[in-house]
Amino acid sequence: KDLRTDQLDRLTKSKTFCMIPWIHMHAFPNGQAFPCCLADSHHPIGHLHKNTVKEVWNDTPYKTMRKNMLEEKSCKECTKCYEQEDMGFVSMRNSSNKNFGNNIGIVDQTLEDGTFEDFKLRYYDIRFSNLCNMSCRTCGGWFSSSWHDEETALYGKREYPKFMFAGKDKEDMWNQLQEHIPYLEQVYFAGGEPLIMEEHYRLLDELERQELFDVRLIYNTNFSKLKLKTKHVFDYWQRFNNVSVGASL
């Protein structure tokens, strides 16, 4: 599809525009919501234990980001991408504009204050929980349940529980995300450890049921467990057309 000059300029020449706030939201296992996984962790755009994904979608922080981007203003959440670009690297902003630029037409629906009513998540990076079977030194209790006992022994009682969920409870986030599955283009699985999470296999089952085999699957996994009960991840991967795995070995 041919793009208008202004659309092409946004995707390739703008120093601040990014497709992410129109297609995506990222959630920590503790419920904090961010535009993406590289966003400044000091500036969450909401909390999914207090509000739904849909409510955060058009709450003031996310609306302000969209408005700033369309006005070619910088966003405090995006400093990591700006820094990478200043050093000559390809940033997540750059790659997102390339990978999701096919959606640039929806940006025209954005209201003057940054409100965007076309609530369809095309890219998931929701850390359903912190469930993990390892306690890697580069991690901690927020992203690995296996760290909790060690942290408690070292520092005393923790301010957060051993097991955490992105939503208000184990089922909440899954229930909110199901309606977006038909629109998915990409899913990033991390955790916790995604290959031992029930939600991971539920999502793959649903993608398979809807025959969405062109959805790009990207993994950050310790690769120590390849199955959950009777479900083996290799049986799923062979059915999808684009699977990328980052494995800790």
Predicted regions and their residues:
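Local cysteine-cluster metal-coordination motifs and their immediate loop/turn environment
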Residues: 20, 35-38, 74-86, 131-141
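C-terminal accessory region of radical SAM enzymes
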Residues: 1-8, 38-85
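Short Cys/His-rich "knuckle" micro-motifs
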Residues: 88-92, 140, 147-149
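Core AdoMet radical
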Residues: 121-131, 142-169, 181-200, 210-229, ...
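Generic structural signal for small/hydrophobic residues in well-ordered secondary structure
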Residues: 28-31, 53, 81, 128, ...
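Recognition helices and adjacent regulatory flanks at domain boundaries
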Residues: 88-122, 132-134
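A short acidic/small-residue loop/turn micro-motif
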Residues: 16, 40-43, 144
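A C-terminal junction/extension of Radical SAM enzymes
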Residues: 1-33, 102-112, 117
